[in-house]
Structure formats: structure tokens, C-alpha cells
């Protein structure tokens, strides 16, 4: 997992509310266990027509979305069924952070375990981002802040352990394995 300290990017905005995991990646793509290539299936039913051609009216198909690593979405992003493929698809596409006013709990946990930063903002700060598609933002994970189009910044909550893992590019298992010597020393000192 690639460490996240700061993210500087233009935003891509999908203002829809209640974007569920089946919309993020439809169920027909869930038969794979390899994360690579899932970015092609991201928002597949919105991005492509019945013949597989790109829909010109979907934001990710336009030149303005090229290179954007911050997705700003409507309220309640990632709701619906639990599928780890949803953050896999976002990360494989190149998204590093998702910004909303609410992120579903299971999606948030899956995102954090896969190097995707879910940011929950207050409605006023979020509205500034929704109103400015393509705005340049800077996310500073250490201070837990994101710059807004008007030059102000907004803070966002994040669990300390999740923050540590993201900043160091490790998942929970990777962290545990990095503590192997300390665990062995503790077990030696604390024999039962």
C-alpha cells in the first residue's frame, strides 16, 4: 500500500446521493480476487452504454477527470452491501480520497484497509467542493485538513490507528507483522 501524507489534485465531482457499492462496481465484476484492472469496471453502468462504449455525459469519461485523484460525492457514499471490490476499483482507477458528508461504515473500513482515504466533511465545506468541480485541493493527512476552493480549509475526523496505517502505507496485518519483535519480547517477559 502506498503511504499517504498529502494529496494534491483537482477534484472530480459526482453529486449523486446514496451511491451504493453496486453502483461503484456492479456485482458481475465480483468474481475476481485480483485488484488489478478493476478500475475499468468503476461505475461501469454509468460510464458505459449497453454496447460497452463510453457515455459522453458521464464525468469520468471527460478530459476534466483525467488525473484527478480526489472524488467528491453526494451524501451517504458507499452504502449498500459490503464488497471490498468497491474500494479496490476506486484505488485501481487512481482515486486516493473520497469526500462526502457521510460515508457508510463498512465501506469506510474497507477503504481504509486498502489505502483509500474516506473524508467526511461538514455540509457547508462539502457544498463548496460540490459547487466547484475541477477545483484544486490539498489534503494534509497529518493535520487532517483539506483546502477548499475559497482558500479556507476544513478539518475531518479520522481514527488515530487508521491515520498511522495510511501515513505509513501498511494495513492492519502489515502493522502487526512490523511489531513481531516487540510481541515476542513481551511474550518472553510475560510468560504465563
Curated annotation (Swiss-Prot):
The lineage of its organism: Bacteria, Pseudomonadati, Myxococcota, Myxococcia, Myxococcales. Heterodimer of LeuC and LeuD. It comes from the Bacteria. CDD domains: IPMI_Swivel (cd01577). Keywords: Amino-acid biosynthesis, Branched-chain amino acid biosynthesis, Leucine biosynthesis, Lyase. Transmembrane segments: none annotated. Pathway: Amino-acid biosynthesis; L-leucine biosynthesis; L-leucine from 3-methyl-2-oxobutanoate: step 2/4. The keyword DNA damage does not apply. The keyword Amino-acid biosynthesis applies. One of its GO terms (molecular function) is 3-isopropylmalate dehydratase activity. SUPFAM superfamilies: LeuD/IlvD-like (SSF52016). Pfam families: Aconitase_C. This is 3-isopropylmalate dehydratase small subunit. GO terms for biological process: L-leucine biosynthetic process. Gene3D superfamilies: Aconitase, domain 4. GO terms for cellular component: 3-isopropylmalate dehydratase complex. It is an enzyme of class 4 (lyase). It catalyses: (2R,3S)-3-isopropylmalate = (2S)-2-isopropylmalate. Catalyzes the isomerization between 2-isopropylmalate and 3-isopropylmalate, via the formation of 2-isopropylmaleate. InterPro entries: 3-IsopropMal_deHydase_ssu (IPR004431), Aconitase/3IPM_dehydase_swvl (IPR015928), AconitaseA/IPMdHydase_ssu_swvl (IPR000573), IPMI_Swivel (IPR033940), LeuD (IPR050075). Its EC number is 4.2.1.33. Belongs to the LeuD family. LeuD type 1 subfamily.
Amino acid at each position: 500500500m502506498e503511504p499517504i501524507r498529502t494529496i494534491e489534485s483537482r477534484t472530480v465531482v459526482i453529486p449523486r446521493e446514496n451511491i451504493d457499492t453496486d453502483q461503484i462496481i456492479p456485482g458481475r465484476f465480483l468474481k475476481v480476487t485480483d485488484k488489478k484492472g478493476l478500475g475499468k469496471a468503476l461505475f461501469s453502468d454509468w460510464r458505459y452504454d449497453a454496447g460497452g462504449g463510453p457515455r459522453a455525459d458521464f464525468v469520468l469519461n471527460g478530459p476534466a477527470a483525467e488525473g484527478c485523484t480526489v472524488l467528491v460525492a453526494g451524501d451517504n457514499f458507499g452504502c449498500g452491501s459490503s464488497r471490498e471490490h468497491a474500494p479496490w476499483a476506486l484505488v485501481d482507477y487512481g482515486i486516493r480520497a473520497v469526500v462526502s458528508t457521510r460515508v457508510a461504515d463498512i465501506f469506510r473500513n474497507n477503504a481504509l484497509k486498502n489505502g483509500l482515504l474516506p473524508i467526511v466533511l461538514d455540509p457547508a465545506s462539502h457544498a463548496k467542493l460540490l459547487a466547484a468541480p475541477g477545483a484544486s485541493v490539498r489534503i494534509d493527512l497529518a493535520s487532517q485538513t483539506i483546502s477548499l476552493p475559497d482558500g479556507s480549509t476544513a478539518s475531518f475526523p479520522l481514527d488515530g490507528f487508521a491515520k498511522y496505517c495510511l501515513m505509513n502505507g501498511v494495513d492492519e496485518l502489515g502493522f502487526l507483522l512490523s511489531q513481531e519483535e516487540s510481541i515476542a519480547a513481551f511474550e518472553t517477559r510475560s510468560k504465563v
